[in-house]
């Protein structure tokens, strides 16, 4: 269990550093929304700043080592909530593409969250990769379900529509301290991220990984909420730990490569 202890120790240290008051969470959000950041972050967008993207610079062939998305690839996760609930999350890279309003052709990734065999949330996420290798998040079409019926589509957005801006879901070359936005649709989707480490150890039901990438996700719309996500090269997301605003753990159970 050496890997579990390593990740647990890392998270304990991070929590100890940030549990003093809401000031820490506020500082994180301020930093992600435009404070001084690492010089290595290049031109990655932050906060609500507009960004102009040339469709000619993008492809649906996503081969970023920290999150390769070849059509047919599938990840299955087990998510344990704070009240003992357990959900199954299936993420599948489809063969479909979506023409985004800003002109970029995006890969469609289908995400289904279910509980007791019934869907509770179904989402189509839209991604594309630029020439540098950054994977951009261009929007989503999401629906939440209750008793088989859609209850809300809150959180859906499309880059180029109603002021929505693209964000980066995975940098080409993640470096410690790098900060950037993942999505921006005012009042609906404003997630930010910060790279914490590129040399973690992690163990999940699917396997044990060294050299994992750890990213902290921040939600300015919900200042008390933060998550730590770990990515393994050649696989993608393997573990998400929610450490404030409640608790929870989502771990990779199986992964099938395309073909």
Which residues fall in each region the model found?
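Bacterial N-terminal signal peptides that target proteins for export
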Residues: 1-8
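Hydrophobic alpha-helical targeting segments used for export or membrane insertion
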Residues: 9-13
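C-terminal motif of bacterial Sec signal peptides marking the signal peptidase cleavage site
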Residues: 15-18
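Conserved functional acidic sites
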Residues: 20-259
């Amino acid at each position: 269990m050496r890997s579990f202890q390593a990740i647990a120790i890392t998270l304990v240290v991070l929590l100890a550093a940030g549990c003093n008051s809401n000031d820490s969470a506020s500082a994180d959000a301020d930093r992600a929304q435009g404070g001084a950041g690492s010089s290595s972050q290049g031109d990655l967008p932050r906060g609500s700043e507009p960004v102009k993207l040339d469709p000619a610079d993008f492809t649906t062939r996503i081969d970023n080592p920290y999150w390769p998305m070849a059509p047919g690839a599938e990840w299955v996760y087990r998510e344990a909530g704070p009240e003992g609930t357990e959900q199954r999350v299936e993420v599948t890279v489809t063969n479909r593409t979506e023409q985004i309003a800003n002109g970029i052709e995006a890969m469609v990734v289908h995400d289904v969250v279910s509980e007791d065999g019934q869907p509770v949330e179904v989402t189509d996420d839209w991604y594309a990769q630029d020439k540098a290798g950054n994977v951009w998040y261009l929007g989503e079409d999401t629906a939440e379900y209750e008793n088989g019926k859609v209850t809300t589509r809150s959180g859906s957005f499309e880059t180029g529509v109603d002021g929505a801006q693209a964000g980066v879901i995975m940098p080409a070359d993640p470096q410690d301290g790098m900060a950037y936005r993942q999505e921006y649709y005012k009042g609906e989707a404003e997630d930010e991220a910060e790279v914490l480490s590129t040399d973690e150890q992690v163990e999940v039901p699917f396997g044990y990984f060294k050299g994992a990438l750890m990213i902290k996700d921040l939600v300015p719309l919900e200042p008390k909420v933060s998550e730590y996500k770990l990515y393994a090269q050649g696989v993608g997301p393997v573990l998400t730990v929610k450490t404030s605003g409640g608790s929870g753990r989502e771990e990779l159970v199986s992964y099938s490569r395309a073909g």
